[in-house]
Amino acid sequence: MGNCTSHPHHEPQVHFDTVDGMATVKAFAGIRQVTMGVLRIDYEYQTNLGDILDPRSFDFRIISATAEGLTFAKAKAGDKLDATGKELLERAVRQLIDNGADFIVGDCGFLVYWQVMVRDYAQDYAQKKYGRKCPVMMSSLVLALPLLATIPSGGQIGILTASEKSLQAVQKKLPIVIEDQQKEDGGQRSRSVPAAEDPSGIMINFSDPRFKVVGLDEVKDFKHALDAQGADAVNDRRDIAVQIAAYCQKVQEKNPQIAAWLIECTEAGGFAWAIKVGTGLPVWDPITLGRFLSLGFTANVPNVALTLGQHGENPLDPSATTAGKGRCTGEEPGQIHALGAEFQAIREGTL
């Protein structure tokens, strides 16, 4: 330990505009709230806190659009869409972007079959019509590869899914589905990403010893809740949460090398909290995915800009505003320039 010398601590003198703070925030960075678009399959279910379609699960705006005709059974099968099915899927994507979606996620893990199709169509449509980008992640499985960097040598990531058999089937069929989509598009999609051999961006092999696929088939109440309709559905989510947490803990005891959990099943995402408490391990899920994508549009740009101020003058307190939930849009005259002339020049391509 080095020598510690006590020095008087002086708080910086910062002046805040408490009268018209939001007007000043607008001048700095804009406060249009980030919007997440949820692409839905043609399937109705009761949403609950923690579900990707429940607005209480996020602190930003959520909109949704349904790919009509793409039922759960069809999504699970991953069969090729006919011309009508493809148009209905693309129409749902257009609705999301036209209504302000900054990025798009799916409400069903099986939508991973259309990751490439939706991603490339969304990017193309958003760019041509609005001159912007629209990131797409249809499944939390896209987090599997980067999460491997977080676990120790010999460790595993437990991938939690509703049905182990169904998820194993996805691995076998996904490359075929993607290849068919590429052929339909004249091979354009394979050239739109750096790794043409894996254009989905989901580089995962469930036979990799670093992954442990765990199905919730044995959790009876959860399976019943998935299968049930209307009044027959299981409503006591606390009981289901306890069952899932206990099941994961038992799996963990048999597989102590599991260092983290990744929830693939969208409807199981609402129980991530129970797994965290029950197992003591970090858990990532579809909600994590939405929050991760939202951070590409929010928080630090307004906060840092407001804290620094223009040329260091009179910074605002970001915690006293909602700027952290907004994105720097450049839609209002002069707002980019308020961050400094160089930022306006960057946007105009003159710097």
Swiss-Prot record:
Entry's EC annotation: 4.4.1.3
Keywords on record: Lyase
Enzyme class, broadest EC rank: lyase
Active-site residues from the entry: 108 (proton donor/acceptor), 265 (proton donor/acceptor)
Catalyzed reaction equations: S,S-dimethyl-beta-propiothetin = acrylate + dimethyl sulfide + H(+)
GO MF term set: dimethylpropiothetin dethiomethylase activity
Note: At least 10 million metric tons of volatile dimethyl sulfide (DMS) are released into the atmosphere annually by the dimethylsulfoniopropionate lyase in oceans. It is a component of the tangy aroma of the seaside and functions as a chemical attractant that guides various marine animals, such as sea birds, invertebrates, and some mammals, toward potential food supplies. DMS oxidation products act as condensation nuclei, causing water molecules to coalesce, with possible effects on local climate through enhanced cloud formation.
Self-association and partners: Homotetramer.
Family from the record: Belongs to the aspartate/glutamate racemases family. ALMA1 subfamily.
Function: Mediates cleavage of dimethylsulfoniopropionate (DMSP) into dimethyl sulfide (DMS) and acrylate. DMS is the principal form by which sulfur is transported from oceans to the atmosphere and is a key component of the ocean sulfur cycle.
Protein known as: Dimethylsulfoniopropionate lyase 1
